[in-house]
Amino acid sequence: MENQPKLNSSKEVIAFLAERFPHCFSAEGEARPLKIGIFQDLVDRVAGEMNLSKTQLRSALRLYTSSWRYLYGVKPGATRVDLDGNPCGELDEQHVEHARKQLEEAKARVQAQRAEQQAKKREAAATAGEKEDAPRRERKPRPTTPRRKEGAERKPRAQKPVEKAPKTVKAPREEQHTPVSDISALTVGQALKVKAGQNAMDATVLEITKDGVRVQLNSGMSLIVRAEHLVF
């Protein structure tokens, strides 16, 4: 047991649990609601494995159940599961409402952070603009060279070195993407890209709805996107 590798972060613990209990935990895509009291089940089942402590398990569970993809899975009609994927009863309305509020608060925090970052960028740009508009120093007049006397020998001009023509830099080839023609062929957890102007952002399918496809970006933000904005 002493030779087992040690998991150093909650994300590594979650990845281990997803591999150890694939019918309960997932490393990507929408997560299933967990059985109440599953912490003690984990302690009993994985005690001593990978040198895991109770503190590590508790921290990993807290991170897992507060993630956006887990909160999306806590919805009316969803069923809790145990470590082996067996159903353990439907979610009650109180837990569904609590998850909805947590998700709204998390989104609000992300929006506030982005607004703060944008404000700092605008402030920095304004400061740089003020420096450019500052009055320039007056240049001193260049000294006049004395005129050559009549009859004096003219010095030969130094020849300028021949400048080499700059090498043309080839423009980078644009990455080719395949548009999504049929959203019904997509699956939850599938990786694809969302077009935003000339760029394409990586995303994961969370849910397929009548209005489009709900995806989650790498930043954690989720949104519903129509098929014409999805590519592989």
UniProtKB/Swiss-Prot annotation:
GO cellular component, one term: cytosol
Compositional bias annotation for Basic residues: 137-146
GO molecular function: mRNA 3'-UTR binding; mRNA binding; RNA strand annealing activity; RNA strand-exchange activity
Keywords (A to Z) from UniProt: Chaperone, Cytoplasm, RNA-binding
Ranges annotated as biased composition (Basic and acidic residues): 117-136, 147-177
Compartment(s): Cytoplasm
HAMAP family: ProQ (MF_00749)
NCBIfam families: PRK04950.1
Protein family: Belongs to the ProQ family.
Name recorded for this polypeptide: RNA chaperone ProQ
Organism: Escherichia coli (strain K12)
